[in-house]
């Protein structure tokens, strides 16, 4: 008869089973969805094969078969990427028809915008000083690009083009659209029927039509209603249309954040003696905006890409300058993919960077960090 002592001794004699290491557990967790079943394994291998073919073709086009020296004639007989095309047309694709000798001004303005965006992305700087920062950035960029003061030559808006124009339209549109969107979100959540109905109608009408329609109306229809002799700059009309369109979408994102705030926060604010605007400014809005940041980042990505629509009203945005560069008689039919590849890389870098930032914010909020 087996006793408890015999069982204990047999367990001591058994070799101890080693716990799998963290690396092995992580590897198993990663590979199981990919190769856990025969179907998953086949799909994974097929995708890897397609990626290998795409990477091999891209490497061959960019490196192995690329033309690195010579001009248009050398690229004409080549079968790969035409790097001399970038050397000849890169500045035009970026800056468009902006005066060549003044490119440093728009480059500096873009650096100002990128610096403001970088500071805005740091959570510890999320305070009212951001309003001052963006006001100074927009004024400084306008002085640099427009000129006419401090010894800078005046450059009309008809010569604003390329990547700086796309960047300006999206950055200014979001900078002015954000406070307007917050006001619309608060108005839509208001208990006053008249204000709530006006906000609802405005938001739903703007969100119910495509951006291209609003741009067309701002460019073509609006001048018809202006008094005789009064004209509004085409770029300004497009910018106002983008601000209005952005505000409607931002309002819905902020309203979602407001609805996620527990009712107890409002009641606690009232118990502390705070009136409506104090409660919103000090208690409710800071929490709602943190919740709404990921969708707001997605809206920013979409609006940067949607700036390509301004070409329909005659503005020379980044994608338009890329296309225009291809019409140079010296390069027609020679460099076809190079311009679009460059534009795709620029949009991809921006979109991926903003998407990664959105995921970072989501992880931060899950951890409950401020």
Model-derived features with residue positions:
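Transmembrane alpha-helices and adjacent helix-loop boundaries
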Residues: 2-370
